[in-house]
Amino acid sequence: MNDPRDIIFRTDPSGEIDGISRRRFLSLLSASAALALGSSCSRIDRGTIVPYTRRPGEIIPGVAAYYASTFQEGLATQGVLVKTREGRPIHIEGNTEHASSRGKAGLRAMGDLLGLYDPDRLRAPVHKGAPCTWDDAEKAMIRTLSAARLQDKPVLLMTGAIVSPTQKALIDDLKRSLPDLRHAAWEPNAPQSEISASSALFGSALVPRLRLDKADVIVSLQSDFLGTDANAPVFIGDFAARRAISKPTDVMNRLWVCEGSMTLTGSNADQRIQVRPSRMAALAFALARLLNESHSLPLPPGLKPEELEPFAIEPVSKSLGIDASMLRLLAADLGRARKSSLVLVGSSLPPEAHLACHLLNNMLGAERNTVDLNSALPAPELLTFADLRDIFSEAAQGKFAAGIFWDSNPAYAFPDRSLWKSAVTKIPETFRIGLYEDETALDCAWRLPEHHWLEAWGDFESASDYISLRQPAIGAIHDTRQAEDFLVSCMRQMKIQDSRNYLEYLKFRWLLNVYPQGSPVPFETFWSAAVHDGGVINETEGPAPLVMNMDAIRSALTASAKTNLESLSGEMELVLYPGAGVYDGRYANNGWLNELPDPVTKATWCNPAMLSTADAERLALKDEDLVEISNGNKTVEAPVIIQPGQAPGVVGLALGYGRLTGNVAVGIGTNAYPLIDASSSSPYLLDGIKIRRKENGERRAIPRRQIHDSMEGHNQIRSWTVEELSKKTADKQDGREKHEMSSLIPKLKFPERKWSMVIDLSACVGCSACVIACQSENNIPVVGPERVLTGREMQWIRIDRYYHGDPRDPSVLLQPMLCQHCDNAPCEIVCPVNATTHSPDGLNQMIYNRCVGTRYCSNNCPFKVRRFNFFDYTSMKKEPESLVYNPEVTVRPRGVMEKCTFCIQRIENVKQKARVEGRQIEDGEIQTACSAACPAGAIVFGNLNDAQSRVAELSKSNRSYRLLEELGIQPSVTYLADVSNPAKEESKA
């Protein structure tokens, strides 16, 4: 090896860099330095420039264009802005003009950008394994539907949740022509218990708007509203608005969490109580009785106090295994806050718990404040697992002429695969319309590729008075079609409707139902404005006054009293919850979302079973032991992770893993859906499960982003109570040490600007939206589970999570960690080729073509935030995946170090714009990817030299501190101490 370049540029760029001895390295060091200083570019980084022959008028080369659109996930929608360059989407952020999501976009909305360019997408129609055309598919669909209409034989149309008024109208039009059409809308992660309880109580299923920003006291009963909930971005924003304490008069909310399986919401609790999920309804009814007896809160008309007799606080506390004084303290908090309180229940709990929640919110008066029933949306009609089982039983008897499976994958998520197989084989003609050749597609004759949502048109009821619009940000990449467009074309040829395509159908429906009749504004102008803004206000009448059916409450009381009397046995409960990244499995082929650490366990690329310390000791289990989890005769395997804060007798397991198709998804985790009991009213909560270690003692490694959970007495995360905060000043903080460090190196000066960041740990909930936004913005590669296991992950931001206190019931502290852009940076002084330097405006910058990969900088970084490219990850990508790259950010080759840049490309874009317009940069105008994505508003970026900037003001807060100040490294990132608001005995007053 004579040429030092060969160390970095090998014949096989995807291979790992060979080890090199210290002697060999030193002999090549001078040559390496000469190479770095004498080369202006890397020969790996070459490309071909292909100009437009005729440039589209709306595209300005080098200038980003933004399109307002809408992301849907189950029953939830989020307004987004799609950033495009030269006609291709490269980044997604929240749309601040969207009335429902209010500028908040979730990590899965941002991460699904990668799904647009997924090389595993179905690229053209297939019929029985052979390529075909869309004309062939249309003829087959028309022939099938026409024959079914003549034979009066039903057709099964299976979809996901329909929250689009135009989609619903399209299906209704099809039903009018095909009276026997069976529309089965089903979501594998639907809030079945919540819908069932609402229907029983009010006579119709409603989805109320929850106003966490108005709540002084929030009680969560196994509800992960800050984590895996599809509406989490909005909830986080509202919750965090009451957590950031900027002045003494601010009133901080208090979060009580009662749960059995540890969640991100539980990690943010001010008070946390471990309760078995099956007993949560009894706890809620006990609180109702206590509020009525001790705090004079009236019961709703028709319900008598004696009906709550079985739920006296002492026996209920004893049966739950918790201290009665904690429940009294909780009741006192609720009694004090009254209408400024809010009780939430998780979708995994049975309907009885949801009915108890409605009772509590009614007694507290929350239904006139924090529970906005006037803005409630009717829940879409959704089938339960039991309903779907009945339909498949009919199909297995040959009762359907055809099956159309659109945006639904029952072959994967329906628990009884044998019944599904029997059903699908007895349906004469089957069509799968979807993104992938997934499990359901493999069982269907026709596999029809659908547009990704970024290629499609659509509309959605995001709120009772707001309709969102979706528009394509790019033309179809493959030979795909929007499912609605395919159906519209077939229906036109069958003389069912007259529109030529779905866009025409959509505009016609808006002309009839949304456009204000008699408006002086032409419809096309109205439509263009709605498309531009991403939606439109649509004034509608609020729901009729709701009357609670007390019989539903009484039934819940009877069932809960019976459960409460049963003693806690040695059998265990299993809580199934959607994966933080993969959700219900729809994103399982997405590398960004698979490599995103679970916010609680920090596991990636798998779904370990969370066990309590007590259960692990009882079963003689250790981390990574492989266990069998059985529910009756159904068994799955998963590795164990011993989770601090997990309630004894409760196991947590994420859904969405164990897929059978997709190059990324196959072999990742275990499919937990087969454990579900289709007949249960709470399918995601399983009683009486068995856990045992594999007989051969097999173990399975868990790729974890963090394996050390303790701060070991250090104070990198400072946490105070509200009471303690009142005694703090900026120069009098516990553990704060100021050192005047003498140095031979002159102190850096930044006469014009000094870019800095402030992170509010009190507002940050650890949702990881910043991690995905950074990965999307900065072309950060996916490394895979094997590399995560060896500590070679590439994400520039991580969320550190630490436990303190009793490991069986700890408190949790969270801290985003990224390059601190130190003024006296330890990484800069050890780089032999000057590849990492300081910019005139305070940025610790990387010059990639100088870097020769010594990794000295990484060794000398006290924050461990630098990442080294051990591989040439770009060469591993398949087309069209490389289209996701942001052209404003260099794609780094193998052998190069990288880290957070404070989004220098965004800084330069704003500087250039301000220079052209002849003005100064405004405070807040520059948003890094992480600060723009943070739904909590916990990250603030700006010019520290501007005394009026938010960054400068927050840096002077009595909560402000910088990490490792005693080293004299002068970080540019300031943290605001975490503030908690635990309940006190005075709350009883």
Residue ranges and their predicted role:
Residues 348, 509-601:
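Long, low-complexity segments enriched in small/aliphatic residues
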Residues 228-249, 415-431, 466-469:
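A short, gly/pro- and small-residue-rich
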Residues 289, 296-318, 475-545, 625, ...:
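N-terminal leader/propeptide and maturation segments of large enzyme subunits in energy/redox metabolism
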Residues 264, 436-470, 793-794, 799, ...:
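Flexible glycine/proline-rich, aromatic-decorated loop/lid segments
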Residues 1-310, 314-315, 321-328, 596-610, ...:
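N-terminal export/assembly segments and adjacent metallocofactor-ligating motifs
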Residues 218-219, 255, 272, 403, ...:
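Short, well-ordered beta-strand core segments
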Residues 271-395, 512-523, 527:
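Active-site phosphate/pyrophosphate-binding segments
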Residues 398, 412-455, 614, 619:
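Hydrophobic alpha/beta core scaffold segments
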